[in-house]
Every structure is written in C-alpha cells, then in structure tokens.
Amino acid sequence: MAEQIELMMRQVKLGGMAKGWRSVRYENTEQYVTELLKLELQEREANRINRMVKTAGFRVLKTLDEFVWNSAIQLPSGLTQEYMTDLHFLTPKENLIFMGTVGTGKTHLATAIALKACQEGRKVQFFTAAGLANLLLEKNNKGTLNNFLGSLKKVELIVIDEIGFVPLHKDAAELLFQVISDCYERKSLIITSNLEFSQWNTVFGDNRLTAALVDRLIHHSHICLLYTSPSPRDIS
C-alpha cells in the first residue's frame, strides 16, 4: 500500500510528499496535511533553485565559505565584506568590479557571490567576456539579438568574467557595450578584469567606446583590488 501511495503522489507531481510522507507524525488532520504540504513546497523551492543555478551558466561552482579573505584584498572606502556577501549592492543596482592579476581569486569571488544570489532565488547569468561577445555576435547574425537582450532584462545580476584576456572584434565590443549600457541603473553587474581601466582600450579597440564604457561602469560601482601576495589560492 505504501508503495502505491508514493506512486500516486508522483503521478500527480507531489514528489516532495512522496519522499518524506512516511516520516511525518500524525497528530490531527490539519497538522498532518500542513506538514505534507510543507514537504512539497520545500522540494519545489529546492528544485527551482537548482534549475536557476544550472541555467545561470557557471563554469565551476564556488562558495563564499571556500574563499579566503586576506589583507591583499583592498576594498574601496565605504564597502564592506558583508555588504557584498549579503547582496546589499543588488538593491540600489550597484556594480562590483574585481581587478587584479591572474590567480588572485577574482573569478572565485564573483562566482560565489552570484551563486549565493541564485540560492536566494535571484535570477543570475554568468558569462566570460569572450563568451558573451561571441554569443552576441551569433545572436546578431541569426537575427535573434533582440530576443536575447530581452531575456537579459529579466536577470537581476550579470557576471562578466575575464575582461582583458582576449581582444574583442569591433562589432563584438559595440554589442558588449550595449549590454553594459542596458544594465545601467536597471540591474547589477559583477565584472572581473586583469587589466586596469587605462588598458581596456586594448580589449575594446576604440578609445571613445572604452572611455564611454568605463564612465558608465564606474558611476555606480565598487572597485575592489585583489593583489597577488598573498593569493587566496596559496593559503591553506
């Protein structure tokens, strides 16, 4: 009979109940039904969060618990670790920009903050700069760019990782500028780069475009510097 009950629960899409109904103590009808419904709601919320994490596009999952905070991480005046990790920057649509050389933990920190946002039910998208640029070119060539940009409007936080690793094609640079401009005061960005702003023209290939992009970015941004010594990867 128990197996039949579980089968029927799954047939009517009550997987949470099917997993845990045997462990629910019966005291009275209202209490029992309430506990069963809680099981189902918890299961559905967990499944929703898992789907959001999968569709966010993270390359590797990293958590804040795994990140090592140290004196080599320089936060700007007025920004605290808690303000970032508690996601307070999302409410005023502020940006976080992590700058530093390779191996300083920029991508880890960006990923971990974005993952926490996902786990709190916020819609997130993670891209590398080169990957997003190529995707924008592809969508533009296929005539589906507007649909893609429309889908980004539903996202609360966009991560653009590794600006500076690969120079961008002129058309790709202009499209990436459009994405960043569209985010201005509408959603938050987390950007990582191994280059100072003064070197971004080597990525975007146009001084005027670069100047406009940087000006737009830094208006509502917290710029965090991550140095190479000590490196979060080297501390155990």
Enumerate the language-model features and the residues they cover:
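Walker A/P-loop
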Residues: 104-119
